[in-house]
A protein has these predicted regions:
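Conserved helicase motor
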Residues: 1-12, 29-35, 136
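Conserved P-loop NTPase motor "coupling/switch" region that bridges the ATPase
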Residues: 3-4, 48-71, 107, 124-216
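Conserved nucleotide-binding/hydrolysis micro-motifs of P-loop NTPases
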Residues: 5-7, 31-34, 114-116, 164-168
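Conserved motor-coupling elements within RecA-like helicase/translocase cores
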Residues: 8-26
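Short aromatic-enriched loop/helix-cap "lid" or pocket-rim segments at secondary-structure transitions
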Residues: 11-14, 38-41, 120-123, 172
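Short basic/glycine-enriched coil/helix segment immediately N-terminal to the Walker B
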Residues: 15-21, 47, 94-106, 148-155
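Conserved helicase/translocase P-loop NTPase motor core
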Residues: 25-34, 71-106, 119, 127-130, ...
Length: 216
């Protein structure tokens, strides 16, 4: 696929060719891949699930008299998810393109998969290095597509390729598992980062040099 294929005037035609053609593989760039959306119904279902998880987390903190800071962080995340849902419900896409589900894709091979490490993360932890408070839209988009392919293939629909699966933090290992082994995490009640971290990790206090090497 070329950039021209994904210009607004050509995108629907190109996606239609994928959906109706008999191809062994279709190779496209990361930025173009993001332009093929999941259906609004599936996006809504996943956002509603995230909202439910956040609500449960907030209630759990209040029940156990958790720190106000942690509660506020989760409430901030909840507000952000609500805004996404409202935007989705009000959405009437002018660029009416074929959705990802309609393409007939049954496998994803993601090269340079480390570019998708900024996936949303909800946690009650504070002052722990490597826990990002931001998310990239392309990561959320890929996560939805991985979940969809898991349903089609029984958890064998996505392959990652990268030379740096973990570059800065063990949180990245958890993120990879969410992409590739989400159902396994759910089966073992490890889909929430705090449960995963308490099972496989240990929080320690230590002096650490900054990436620039100019301080601690």
């Amino acid at each position: 696929a070329t950039k021209r294929d994904f210009e607004t005037k050509n995108r629907k035609k190109f996606c239609g060719r994928i959906a109706t053609g008999d191809y062994d593989a279709v190779i496209i760039g990361h930025s173009q891949f993001e332009k093929i959306p999941m259906s609004i119904e599936r996006q809504r279902a996943i956002l509603e699930q995230q909202l439910e998880e956040l609500t449960d987390g907030i209630m759990d903190l209040k029940r156990n008299r958790g720190e106000n800071f942690s509660i506020k962080q989760l409430e901030k995340s909840k507000k952000s998810v609500k805004q996404k849902l409202e935007k989705l419900n009000d959405q009437s896409r002018k660029d009416d393109v074929v959705t990802f589900e309609e393409l007939g894709v049954d496998r994803l091979f993601i090269d340079e998969s480390h570019y998708y490490k900024n996936l949303y993360l909800y946690t009650k932890m504070r002052n722990v290095g490597g826990i990002a408070q931001t998310e990239a839209q392309k990561s959320s988009d890929l996560f939805m597509k991985c979940r969809y392919l898991d349903e089609l293939t029984g958890g064998r629909g996505t392959v990652f390729a990268t030379g740096t699966p973990i570059s800065n933090s063990m949180v990245e290992l958890y993120t990879i598992q969410r992409y590739l082994q989400y159902n396994t995490l759910v089966k073992n009640n490890l889909q929430h980062f705090d449960s995963w971290a308490s099972t496989f990790g240990e929080t320690v206090t230590a002096v650490e040099l900054t990436p620039e090497g100019t301080g601690y």
